[in-house]
Amino acid sequence: MKKIGIISLIVIIIDRILKVLVTNNFVLNVRNKIIDGFFYITNCHNEGAAFSLFSGNVLFLIFITLIVLFLIYRTINKENVNKIGIFAYGLLLGGILGNLYDRIFYGYVIDYLDFRIFNFNFAIFNLADAAIVIGAILLIVFEGSDNDGRKNKDRSRKLRKEWKNR
């Protein structure tokens, strides 16, 4: 649990630093070219969740976030989390808490990473969002794996046996 907390804290600190830098150095809603046609910094405020879903419902989003945090906490405490899981949960919690901070103190999330791929304008997001997505993907892909990322066959067999013996 301690390692998960350290990873989360690192994500939160880097996320806060980047959001403060963007807020202090980039005009709101102005696209700033970093790599022409591909990567821009665009300081914008997202009052909703991903893709501005539930926009304007800050209290609802805070409430849902607190429920998700509680569920993750319970999951971490119930399961034996491997190295990949520690990293994944650290990213996930750091990202969730980074965006929760914004919602509580500003009423919106500060987004700034703006990518265009083949003239397709992808959603503007932030480091916390990226941490959430990467953490979730790692948990999905490596669920039930041992420390090296290999499927833990013994654990699977044991769980199947327990289920059959009910």
Regions found by a protein language model. Give the residues of each.
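Alpha-helical transmembrane bundles and membrane-interface segments of multipass inner-membrane proteins
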Residues: 1-166
